[in-house]
Amino acid sequence: MRGFMASEPLTLRQRNVLRLLWLACLPASFVNTVFTQTATYAAAEFNVSERGQGFAAAIVRWGVVIALPFAFSADRFGRRKMIVAMSWLAPIVVSLGALSPSFGFLVATQTIGRPLGISLSIFIVVFATEEMGTNTRAWALSVLAVGSGVGAGSAVGALPLAGISDTSWRYVYIVGLLWLVVAVVLTRSLPETKRFIALQHQQHEETPSHHSAAVSAHIHRDRLWLQIAVAVLTNIFIATASVFQIRYLKDVRDYSASLVAVFTTITAIPASFGLMIGGRIADQRGRKNLAIVTIPLGAVLIATSYGFASYMMWLTAILGGICLGLAYPAMAVFRSELFPTAKRNIASAIITTASLIGGSIGLIGAGLLLDHDVSYATVMMGFAMGPVLVAVLVFTKYPETAHRKLEELNPEDSLLQIL
């Protein structure tokens, strides 16, 4: 069990914050998952074609741009306020899908609601990065990723409700209202991060003749563009491999719906262990060495699984999932470590927006190739070159951030008086 624990003890405040953020991950990931799980059932009720479903999925994915003004607000008015607001708004807006008189209305509610969940996820990661210790940031994100898996799993677990009748998929959206319990807990108990409080103190001391470097900090453009490139190259593969997996198993391997569910579950569980172990390794031994090995290896293994049948398909998918699970904490923590406190949320939101839009372009490209009878193995291996290039960029361009304070990585924050 030691391999799953943090590399150093957490303070009482850090433990409490991590518990609250873990709870916040539940509605965030439910909101981000529910449309994907129910779109087919809703489309059947409204007689929407597969092409229409694909177009709807792209619209919902591109709605991520809505997250940008919320991220700006989180940097301006506080992390706590926006996390609490999103924990209320996201489940409520998404649940409006249950009232849909048309497929277009459903898409509209999810185009607004899903970005609220994405915003919540971004703010959670930034909050954890700012509150955890120098040697526990990556591990904390691995814990939160497990929470996100539980929240997404709740959407999958509610899916049998969609099979009751042609219109019962609406019940799955109503289930999301149960997560308002989390909003109540966060409203009562979540504090503000110490770093944002220190930034606010600096803002109050601003005068025309005195400008704080922390308050007037800008996004490091070189770091931003680098992380956008890495996020897009990674998500083009991840999104394509995950979205087309069900279609591959169903059409090529002739798997039933039940067997698809078993395959998804069996291959995902080991990846969660990879998350926990990866977080500890990233904090103890560094992010870069872990990432440059596990990202390309995981992508190639998963791409290879599309060329195998029987047990080799399962084995390569499991091993690939473990590798990407190991890589996730290291890569996720980079997004918020490398930007100053005053711009941490908006920078993360810009990267996430680019990643999702890039991933949708990858989905369109993969769909065109597959429709022209290019094999799944060829398409996936071609897209896996994205993560291979990511490893090169991380090795040559990324700084090592393990064992370093955020203020060391972002010198403009060095004068913040963090209590």
Regions found by a protein language model. Give the residues of each.
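Glycine-rich segments within core transmembrane alpha-helices of 12-TM secondary carriers
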Residues: 136-164, 179, 349-363
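Helix-breaking motifs and short loop linkers at transmembrane-helix boundaries and internal kinks
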Residues: 47, 78, 99-104, 133, ...
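Cytoplasmic helix-loop-helix junction between adjacent transmembrane helices
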Residues: 109-146
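Extracytoplasmic
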Residues: 16-50, 241-246
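Extracytoplasmic gate region of multi-pass secondary transporters
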Residues: 35-36, 220-275
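Symmetry-related core transmembrane helices of the 12-TM Major Facilitator Superfamily/SLC fold
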Residues: 170-187, 378-395
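Central cavity-lining transmembrane alpha-helices of secondary-active solute carriers
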Residues: 57-72, 265-277
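Conserved MFS/SLC helix-loop-helix module at the cytosolic interface between two early adjacent transmembrane helices
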Residues: 66-101, 282-288
